[in-house]
Curated annotation (Swiss-Prot):
Non-essential, abundant cell division factor that is required for proper Z-ring formation. It is recruited early to the divisome by direct interaction with FtsZ, stimulating Z-ring assembly and thereby promoting cell division earlier in the cell cycle. Its recruitment to the Z-ring requires functional FtsA or ZipA. This is Cell division protein ZapB. Pfam families: ZapB. The gene is zapB. It comes from Shewanella halifaxensis (strain HAW-EB4). Homodimer. The ends of the coiled-coil dimer bind to each other, forming polymers. Interacts with FtsZ. Keywords: Cell cycle, Cell division, Coiled coil, Cytoplasm, Septation. Residues 3-59 form a coiled coil.
């Protein structure tokens, strides 16, 4: 191989490595976002369960008053 071809190959390899590093950083950001959204989802599900229990209790009280 000529030095020119080796230089081009080195440039392409360097660009590929930089792309891989950028993709790794993006993946880490996405993992953090996913984790945060998962925690938020769990909290919202707990709040929904709590509200459903409260509403069920209030409906039960209303039914007792009506009967």
């Amino acid at each position: 191989m000529s030095l020119e071809l080796l230089s081009k190959l080195e440039t392409k390899i360097q660009a590929a490595l930089e792309t891989i590093e950028l993709l790794k950083m993006e993946l880490e950001e996405e993992k953090q976002t996913s984790s945060s959204l998962s925690e938020q989802n769990q909290q919202l599900q707990q709040e929904l369960t709590s509200w459903n229990e409260k509403v069920t209790g209030l409906v039960g009280l209303l039914n007792e008053e009506v009967n």
